[in-house]
Amino acid sequence: MDGEDDSNLVIKKRFVSEAELDERRKRRQEEWEKVRKPEDPKECPEEAYDPRSLYERLQEQKDRKQQEYEEQFKFKNMVRGLDEDETNFLDEVSRQQELIEKQRREEELEELKEYRSNLNKVGISAENKEVEKKLAVKPIETKNKFSQAKLLAGAVKHKSSESGNSVKRLKPDPDPDDKAQEAPSCMSLGSSSLSGPPSIHCPSAAVCIGILPGLGAYSGSSDSESSSDSEGTINATGKIVSSIFRTNTFLEAP
């Protein structure tokens, strides 16, 4: 009996009586009167009938909440505009940066001007030193040129006699006072016809420079000795032997 009563109770709870429906409708009307606006109807609208099961309705609510959560944390929804305080702060920071950059540029310009002025001073001093060096070197060069020209002045090339090997030499213009003191150089002669060992012939120290007026001419005995300032002898091997003594003696060659 008890089991049957319980089953009947469960079955009864699955159905709603008309009295319960009227009571619910009355409570809903009272609530509607509290929130109703003048343009709203006087009677409370009936509840919409939903034929879906409870599972489907709960799943719908769950999906709706998930969509709201995702929409809240989307990137486009995370971006927001700046307020007035933030914009003022950013403006102040940018202004400070511009001042610092301007000061740095001014310091660089000052350093460049100072460097250029120092460079110009150094360049002018270096140019002055170079000019002074050139002025100091020019007199020395001119002096050397004059001394070389003076040394080369009066140098005359003479051609020796053709009695032996041709020899060319440079000889300054002789001075009449020094001509008597010059040592004549020996030149090559023909092969000696004299028999015996070769000998060295030294011309006489007394060389005739000129004839003074009022003096007679001497005999030609010494003409062979003073005919040339470059006389000499050749030994048996054909080697030129220079005169070393200004005398009339003959020295035997080794």
UniProtKB/Swiss-Prot annotation:
Region Disordered: start-end pairs: 22-53, 154-198
Ranges annotated as biased composition (Low complexity): 188-198
Disulfide feature: none
Any Gene Ontology biological process: negative regulation of proteasomal protein catabolic process
Tissue expression from the record: Expressed in skeletal muscle.
Keyword terms of this UniProt record: Acetylation, Nucleus, Phosphoprotein
Interaction with PSME3, as annotated region: 201-254
Biased composition (Basic and acidic residues): 170-181
GO cellular component, one term: nucleoplasm
Modified residues (N-acetylmethionine): 1
Residues with the N6-acetyllysine modification: 138
Subunit comment: Interacts (via C-terminus) with both free and 20S proteasome-bound forms of the proteasome activator complex subunit PSME3/PA28G; the interaction is direct.
Biological role: Promotes the association of the proteasome activator complex subunit PSME3 with the 20S proteasome and regulates its activity. Inhibits PSME3-mediated degradation of some proteasome substrates, probably by affecting their diffusion rate into the catalytic chamber of the proteasome. Also inhibits the interaction of PSME3 with COIL, inhibits accumulation of PSME3 in Cajal bodies and positively regulates the number of Cajal bodies in the nucleus.
UniProt name for this protein: PSME3-interacting protein
Source species of the chain: Mus musculus
